[in-house]
Amino acid sequence: MKSYLSNDTEAKLKKTKDLPPHIHFIGIGGIGMSALAMILAQKGYSISGSDQKKNLTLKKLEENKVHIFPTQVESNIDEILKVHGKNILVVKSSAIHQDNFELCKAKKYNLKIKHRSEILAFLIEQKKSIIVSGSHGKTTTSTYITTLFSYANKSPTAIIGGIVPLYKSNYSCGNSEFLIAEADESDGSLVKFNPNIGLITNLELEHVDHYLDLEDLIETMKQFAQKCECLITNFDCDNLRDNIHGSKWFSIQKIINIDFALIPKESNGCEIIAEYYEKEKFIDVIKIPVPGIHNLSNAAAAIAACRVAGILFKDIKKGIEKLKLPSRRFEFKGLWRNRLIVEDYAHHPSEIDAAISIASTIIETKHKLSKILPRRIVTIFQPHRYSRTKKFQKEFAKSLSKSDLVFITPIYSAGEDKIEGINNKSIGHELKKINPNLEIYTPDNNQNLIKLIKEQTIENDLILIMGAGDINLISENLFLELINNKLISNDIAA
């Protein structure tokens, strides 16, 4: 198969204006911002950043000679100007409010200010790019593409919204001409990109804080589609099939008139056996070593992107057996008191459905994990954003009703103001309407949640912790307790 990547890299480089020698990131600890900062630091730019939350990412940045300010105050900008002068660039994300002290000071001094998407666009223009967008599966799909490229000896630059197991990082500064990145649709900024290959995994209304309705989202995705040299889209998604026609289709349901099909044959909750077809021609039987039908779709998308980029299937197959999910995507954390702890980033009803579906398959197929045979699905869900919770409250309840025991924590606001009557208890109320017999708990804080987990769960439970906020702290606290009590199990799921 010929590559659909054009040979215009040199022309792109000639058109691309360079960035100022020093770049300051407001909120540098975020998953997207930190990846950009690390790439630019390795390219030789002087980098600084501020973040009020301590995490391992900041430590990594400091190890790479990035200066970190632990607060976001006006004096940070003054300090930077003393050292670097006014020829600096300030980078912000959509999460940074207009009244941020550093941002206000940068505006006062008339400094150059750019959105993070403009920095990503700058990097895209310098490479042959594969840009992944869509409502769900962006991080997993871009992780898969990066992994397959790497095992095909293509050494890509990668900017990913999660930790890629191969690199144990959210970025890679490769030495080839390829760049793989996610295009975040949450704020509409993806229309700034001009990808060689664009890929849309699926389309569903999620970010109700930015989009009025599904039609509004579709119009934005159409703009992105028009800017792609070659567009790969998911035939199995009604919203894509009916509204956005790509250059190439992939599917896990259909072979006829499909460019890349990956049809499932067997599944046991940890891997899927599938038949691979190109333009209706059978190519091979392959084993995808990750669970979940949605992850098979992500794998099909990744294979399609690699083939369109010109990578031989025999080279792709070498990497398929090495595929692993990124962090917090049905991630097995280990055993806690003979309960299996799993974390997932699910924060939309469809994502919760997908995560619970994997858990159900594990139980139905009696697949033994970490020396236990899971028998019940216990879900711990942290709603993310008041606006999303209000919009999808009934849908959240319907998805969670497929569990055997449910804990719903207070809403992670992500900077949003509270909405009267919208909280964890209102979801619990909707859940009771669907299943009056379901055991539901709505604790007011993490301390009470941990107490309830100890009291209400039993051995052989599969405890599925879901959410896009800081709910991962729960598993950390549970395992920390084991360490403190010298009861830690070293039997971590592979």
Curated annotation (Swiss-Prot):
It comes from the Bacteria. It catalyses: UDP-N-acetyl-alpha-D-muramate + L-alanine + ATP = UDP-N-acetyl-alpha-D-muramoyl-L-alanine + ADP + phosphate + H(+). Pathway: Cell wall biogenesis; peptidoglycan biosynthesis. Belongs to the MurCDEF family. Its EC number is 6.3.2.8. Keywords: ATP-binding, Cell cycle, Cell division, Cell shape, Cell wall biogenesis/degradation, Cytoplasm, Ligase, Nucleotide-binding, Peptidoglycan synthesis. ATP binds at residues 134-140. InterPro entries: Mur-like_cat_sf, Mur_ligase_C, Mur_ligase_C_dom_sf, Mur_ligase_cen, Mur_ligase_N, MurCDEF_pg_biosynth, UDP-N-AcMur_Ala_ligase_MurC. The gene is murC. This is UDP-N-acetylmuramate--L-alanine ligase. GO terms for biological process: cell division; cell wall organization; peptidoglycan biosynthetic process; regulation of cell shape. The keyword Transcription regulation does not apply. Disulfide bonds: none annotated. It comes from Prochlorococcus marinus (strain NATL2A). It is found in: Cytoplasm. Cell wall formation. GO terms for molecular function: ATP binding; UDP-N-acetylmuramate-L-alanine ligase activity. The lineage of its organism: Bacteria, Bacillati, Cyanobacteriota, Cyanophyceae, Synechococcales. GO terms for cellular component: cytoplasm.
